[in-house]
Each structure stands twice: as structure tokens, then as C-alpha cells.
Amino acid sequence: MQISLPALLSQLLLGLVNGSFYAILSLGLAVIFGLLNVINFAHGALFMMGAILSWMAMNYFGISYWVMLVAAPVIVGVFGVLIERLLLRWIYKLDHLYGLLLTLGLTLLIEGAFRSVYGVSGLGYDTPELLEGATDVGFMMLPNYRAWVVVASLVVCFATWYLIEKTRLGAYLRAGTENPRLVEAFGINVPLMVTLTYGFGVALAAFAGVLAAPVIQVTPLMGQNLIIVVFAVVVIGGMGSIMGSILTGLGLGIVEGLTKVFYPEASSTVVFLIMVVVLLVRPAGLFGKET
């Protein structure tokens, strides 16, 4: 089978775009699990919530994409803070299954609420005028918006990694997870820190949702299929591993894109095949710590 270079690079770019979404979403999951020890199944619904809030703001109030790129994560982050304070705080000392079931229930409620208003049909979201069109880079036409998605995702992902792994605040977050009493002895409000961490994690999902709105059809169910893949990404990278989630998300997006070129029939399952192999060889994940 002969594949032209532009076609190959186009699929590679598409894989990188999908990988960017995987990276941001899996990063949010890793932050929440690594620091709060909660499996947040509502992540896909909150990703969708960010996209639909952006669509609503644009269509009902004329608020631009750029404003919602900041506003939607803030709104969803505040919603996440309420979820953590009212619901999640009661299950931290229980088995992971309780958190999974609780967030699954939240997913059904959130998706059901939006589906009752908008149905399941796609909602059109125009590409921002500034990023319309494509740039000729010689060997292919590079869509401006897709290039923006990759750049924005990389900046957000590595800024988050730096914040958690290289700053004093990140050190407090990690220490608060392992020994909250010791951190509280230094005057740090650990419960507030935990609440804000969950809010930040779901804000990342909303940010990814706004980024995805012009690329992926906006529907109340848009997070369902994506979140299954993202959970696989987190497992492959290592539960709670920040850098593992970023690199694995980007890498698997590229692998998925190339699989669509050379063996399209396996493109929807290749991530899960890799997950099975990784779990057999290294159960803690590629970047996870063996216990």
C-alpha cells in the first residue's frame, strides 16, 4: 500500500491533535487520582460541559471563543469545588469503588441534564476567525486551528507538570497527600488545598472541551467514548504519574493516527491492545512506581 507523504503527515497531525486532548484529560485524571486518590469518572462529562458552555456563551450571548477558553474552565472548576465539598470529601477513606460509582452517577446526571435540553444531535461550533484556514509549510497544508490545539495543549500540560513537580506549592500538594497532619503543622490548610486541586483537575477537562469544540462535534455525549480511551492512557502511563499521562497521551494519539493509515481496522482498539501488553509486562504502568 502506497501512502503519499502529505496524507501520512495529515494523519500524523490528526493523531497529534487527538493525543493533545488525551494528554490534557489524562493529566487532569492523574492530578486528581495522584493527589486525592479518587478515580474521577465524571471527567468526560466535565469535558463536555466545558464545550457546551462555550457553545452556549457564543450562541446565546455572543461571547467569543477566547473569553470562554478562560471562563469555561473557571466555571467548571467552581462546579468541581462544589462537588468536592458536598460529595467527594466523604469518601476519601473508602475504597476506590465508591469514588468510581459516585462520579459515574454524576456523569449520568450531568449528561442527562444537557441531553434533555439539546438532545444528542451535534451543535455547530465555528473555528475562531483568527485561526481559520491553513498555512502552507511546503510539504503539506497545516490547518491553523489544529496547530493551535497542539501548541496550547503542550503549554498547559508542561506548565501543570512544572507547577506540581517543581514548585513549593506542588511540594505542599504532594506532601499533603502523603502526610496531611505534618503539612497542617506548617499552617497549610490541607482540606482547602484538596478542594482546589479537584477544581483545578476538572478545569483542565473543561479547557480541553473548549479546545475540542471546533474540532469534535459538540454533543452532550461527546465525552463518553473519549473518556474510555483516556482512562486507558492513564493506566498505560501509570496511575497518578503527571509526566506519564502527558507523554503517553501524546504518544498514543500519534500511534492511533498512524494505525488509521496502515491498518484502519485496528485504529479503535490499538490503545487497548497496548494497555493489555503494558499491564502484563509492567502493571504499574510505563511511568508508574512499582509497589
Which stretches of residues belong to each language-model region?
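Membrane-interfacial amphipathic/re-entrant helices at transmembrane-helix boundaries
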Residues: 1-24, 53, 63-68, 94-98, ...
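Cytosolic-side transmembrane-helix boundaries in multi-pass membrane proteins
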Residues: 7, 86, 117, 178-185, ...
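Single transmembrane alpha-helix segments in multi-pass membrane proteins
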Residues: 7-58, 86-93, 97-98, 234-242
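Helix-loop-helix "hairpin" substructures at the membrane interface of multi-pass membrane proteins
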Residues: 18, 140-218, 242-248
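Transmembrane alpha-helical segments in multi-pass inner-membrane proteins
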Residues: 22, 26, 62-74, 198-205, ...
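Hydrophobic core segments of alpha-helical transmembrane domains in multi-pass membrane transport
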Residues: 51-55, 72-79, 104-114, 152-161, ...
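Alpha-helical transmembrane segments within multi-pass membrane transporters and channels
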Residues: 62-106, 113, 247-248, 252, ...
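Transmembrane helix-bundle core of multi-pass membrane transporters
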Residues: 90-166, 193-196, 217, 258, ...
